[in-house]
């Protein structure tokens, strides 16, 4: 099928843009759904199912919690002096030593996790007059009664327990973490058998802080054959400060200190297996790629991760508005140009020319306008990732039961943050999509205006994205229009001559219209004459009377 108005002395170039049979729906500011030729998914909704061991240093806790590894539970001896970027705690982890509690468990866990090391230095505390290294059948090391390897259980010696007063200065250039405890016997008899006195007292001080604990004697639920307990406490000694320990009984003494480091190490609860792979972002579900700006796999993350949002999908337009080609129009689709619809099968570019002249038909992409649009779109995804990817870890929030209101408040704050980010993400993507569509439409209009200014009066805008050229324009001529080297003056005289000839033909072929207009006028005149004659006849017969008043 020929392009409109074509003969051997004219040519018809059309401008159009790429189209696909089935586009992708995206959201913009002005439209909930608009079809584009191509779009990229922005939400990562699945994990690999395993935690990658690179580039982060992963330490698998296996059967041990971090605190058990810190204290030196016998079945966690393999973790002594270990280091990590991320410590993985498993749901199967259990304690297998003397039953204990940590009043500020979450803070201690977080402090040690962020330090990223269990490096321990023994120190020579002088515990005179008491027996050291007490053990229990509830804490076996092999077949021998034992205790936490990082703690020293002190009890009576020859039925004596003198008051203890020990100091340990920090002459280093780093913070020291001391772990100590207080033993709570289940009965008064157990208290006196171990510590002689009916009630002991433990006070641990530095220049900045002081903690005093009085044992709480009484039976508790049985755990591993014991109804007594140990409470674990911790003290940080700054460089130049001094650790002072006073006790009259019930002291579980430190054997040394842990080095505290500042860093971005963390801890995560997960049962995902650890695999040999590489991923910057880790969630409890497993590692996820970070090549998208958003994810809805898990709120808890570690590493450089996409921002968590509620949406399952957000699509970023990376192509132009899609107007599928009308199949009823033959090989040239819309015979017209971009104003009516797009062109399918244009694989070399987003914008281009189709033409028909005396040499036949052809098609070519306009690479300059295509590249201009692509350059502006290509950076969008990277900019979104830079704006949204978290370069820090979002750790779990833990609170004790007495801090339930704080936990509720924390949950509310986190949920509000997620709601805000989910809304911001949707708005941000809609804005970017609107800009992309406006941008690609603008490039099409620029190309059309550039062509129109080249042709000037040598061609006529057909109103559908095509031009009717009033001079013979071979393929070389069409090529000059495409590449911007068309010389209007060369073809001006021929174009004007052909334009007048074609208009003359159109004028002659318009005689039928004149005849129709004349016939219509005569018919109206005859109708008026008949109507006037009827009125005069009726007046003569007296059927109609006319009164003229002046």
Curated annotation (Swiss-Prot):
GO CC annotation terms, alphabetical: host cell plasma membrane; membrane; viral envelope; virion membrane
SUPFAM superfamilies, A to Z: Influenza hemagglutinin (stalk), Viral protein domain
Disulphide bridges, residue numbers: 14-466, 52-277, 64-76, 97-139, 281-305, 473-477
Residues on Extracellular side: 1-514
Lipidated residues (S-palmitoyl cysteine): 539, 546, 549
Positions of the record's site feature: Cleavage: 329-330
Subcellular location: Virion membrane; Host apical cell membrane
Residues bearing attached sugar chains per UniProt: 8, 22, 38, 63, 126, 165, 483
Residues exposed to the Cytoplasmic side: 536-550
Pfam families: Hemagglutinin
Post-translational modification note: Palmitoylated. In natural infection, inactive HA is matured into HA1 and HA2 outside the cell by one or more trypsin-like, arginine-specific endoprotease secreted by the bronchial epithelial cells. One identified protease that may be involved in this process is secreted in lungs by club cells.
GO molecular function, one term: host cell surface receptor binding
Membrane topology: Single-pass type I membrane protein
Signal peptide (residue range): none
Family membership noted in the UniProt record: Belongs to the influenza viruses hemagglutinin family.
Quaternary structure annotation from Swiss-Prot or TrEMBL: Homotrimer of disulfide-linked HA1-HA2.
Protein's job: Binds to sialic acid-containing receptors on the cell surface, bringing about the attachment of the virus particle to the cell. This attachment induces virion internalization either through clathrin-dependent endocytosis or through clathrin- and caveolin-independent pathway. Plays a major role in the determination of host range restriction and virulence. Class I viral fusion protein. Responsible for penetration of the virus into the cell cytoplasm by mediating the fusion of the membrane of the endocytosed virus particle with the endosomal membrane.
HAMAP family listed in its UniProt record: INFV_HEMA
Identification of the protein by name: Hemagglutinin
Organism for this UniProt entry: Influenza A virus (strain A/Memphis/6/1986 H3N2)
Organism lineage string: Viruses, Riboviria, Orthornavirae, Negarnaviricota, Polyploviricotina
This protein's encoding gene: HA
């Amino acid at each position: 099928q020929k392009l409109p108005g074509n003969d051997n002395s004219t040519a018809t170039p059309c401008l159009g843009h790429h189209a696909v049979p089935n586009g992708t729906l995206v959201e913009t500011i002005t439209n909930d759904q608009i079809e584009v030729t191509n779009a990229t998914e922005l939400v990562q909704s699945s994990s690999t199912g395993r935690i990658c061991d690179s580039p982060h240093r992963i330490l698998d806790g296996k059967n041990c919690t971090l605190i058990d590894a810190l204290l030196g539970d016998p079945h966690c001896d393999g973790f002594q002096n270990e280091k990590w970027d991320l410590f993985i705690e498993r749901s199967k982890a259990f304690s297998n030593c003397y039953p204990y509690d940590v009043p500020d468990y979450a803070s201690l866990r977080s402090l040690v996790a962020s330090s990223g090391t269990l490096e321990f230095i023994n120190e020579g505390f002088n515990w005179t007059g008491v027996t050291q290294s007490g053990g229990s059948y509830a804490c076996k090391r092999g077949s021998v009664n034992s205790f936490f390897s990082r703690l020293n259980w002190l009890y009576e010696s020859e039925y004596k327990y003198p008051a203890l007063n020990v100091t340990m200065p920090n002459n280093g250039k780093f913070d020291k973490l001391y772990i100590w405890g207080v033993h709570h016997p289940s009965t008064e008899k157990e208290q006196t058998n171990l510590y002689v006195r009916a009630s002991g007292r433990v006070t641990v001080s530095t220049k900045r802080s002081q903690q005093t604990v009085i044992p709480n004697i009484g039976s508790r639920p049985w755990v591993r054959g014991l109804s007594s307990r140990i409470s674990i406490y911790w003290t940080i000694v700054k460089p130049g400060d001094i650790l002072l320990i006073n006790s009259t009984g019930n002291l579980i003494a430190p054997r040394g200190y842990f080095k505290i480091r500042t860093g971005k190490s963390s801890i995560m609860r997960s049962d995902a297996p650890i695999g040999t792979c590489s991923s910057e972002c880790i969630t409890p579900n497993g590692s996820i790629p970070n090549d998208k700006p958003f994810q809805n796999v898990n709120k808890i993350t570690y590493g450089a991760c996409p921002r968590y949002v509620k949406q399952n999908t957000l699509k970023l337009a990376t192509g132009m508005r899609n107007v599928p080609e009308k199949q009823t129009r033959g090989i040239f689709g819309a015979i017209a140009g971009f104003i009516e619809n797009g062109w399918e099968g244009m694989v070399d570019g987003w914008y281009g020319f189709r033409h028909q002249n005396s040499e036949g038909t052809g098609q070519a992409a306009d690479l300059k306008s295509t590249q201009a649009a692509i350059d502006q779109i290509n950076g969008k995804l990277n900019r979104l990732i830079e704006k949204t990817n978290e370069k820090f870890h979002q750790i779990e929030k833990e609170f004790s039961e007495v801090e339930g209101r704080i936990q509720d408040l924390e949950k509310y704050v986190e949920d509000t943050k997620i709601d805000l980010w989910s809304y911001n993400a949707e708005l941000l993507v809609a804005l970017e999509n609107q800009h992309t569509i406006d941008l690609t439409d603008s490039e099409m209009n620029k190309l059309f205006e550039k062509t129109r200014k080249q042709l000037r009066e040598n061609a006529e805008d057909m109103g559908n994205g095509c031009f009717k050229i009033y001079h013979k324009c071979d393929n070389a001529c069409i090529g000059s229009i495409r590449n911007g080297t068309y010389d209007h003056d060369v073809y001006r005289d021929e174009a004007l001559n052909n334009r007048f000839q074609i208009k003359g033909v159109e004028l002659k072929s318009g005689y039928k219209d004149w005849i129709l207009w004349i016939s219509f006028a005569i018919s109206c005149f005859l109708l008026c004459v008949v109507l006037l004659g009827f009125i005069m006849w009726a007046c003569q017969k007296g059927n109609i009377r006319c009164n003229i008043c002046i």
